[in-house]
Amino acid sequence: MKKEYLKFSKEIKAIIIIILILTLIFGFNDNKPEFILKNWLLNLLYVFILVSMIILFNTLGYKLVAKYLGAEIEIKALNSHVFKDKFRLFKLYKYVFTPVLPVLITLFSNGKFFFTPVGTFDIKDYNIFGRKFPKITYFNHGLIATGGLFFNFILMLIFKSAGLDKGILISSWFIIWQLWPFSNLPGAKIFLASRALYIFSLIFFIGNILLIQSLPVIYAIILSLLVSIILAVIYFYFLEYLKA
């Protein structure tokens, strides 16, 4: 019981850290001609609310898909020790591709460049009774990652219908960087699960992000879905199926 509580507490801390860092990234520059502390703080609060919704939706998506597949996920901030062997000099591993780097980029760019890969998730395998595989597979990992991003996409559509441009902006950059196939990011989990699934996810999400700016939502979804399916099928058939 105590172990589960500590794990839950650790996950809550990670979620709070991720929310605070992303709030700073997207709220640091309020794009006003002059700095007024009151307005800056109000904008920061507004961004905090939007970011909290995005992270909670993302977490909910991961957990629901994981539960369906018989697994449990834990939200984590990117771990600097993953890069300890590659960046030993001056302990650079503490600053390279960890939550520290996005903050530094925000400060040096005056909040005009959004570098958001600060969080990810880990999965603990469980037996899946009644299913073909006794353990969670890499493909299941990819499905969980895709599910979390799909929940973010749904929230982005809600922001679109509500006319919340800031919410669309934050959601877009969050999804884009989560799709990056690097380290332990969700994009890497999808990429390792299936190249075809990764191509589908990449084209579908980024296609929608670009198209909903100029097309009705339903047209953007249909067009992105068709293109992503076609490209994923072409890749799978010519580069995997024929070479198998």
Locate predicted features.
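Hydrophobic transmembrane alpha-helices and their immediate loop junctions
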Residues: M1-A244
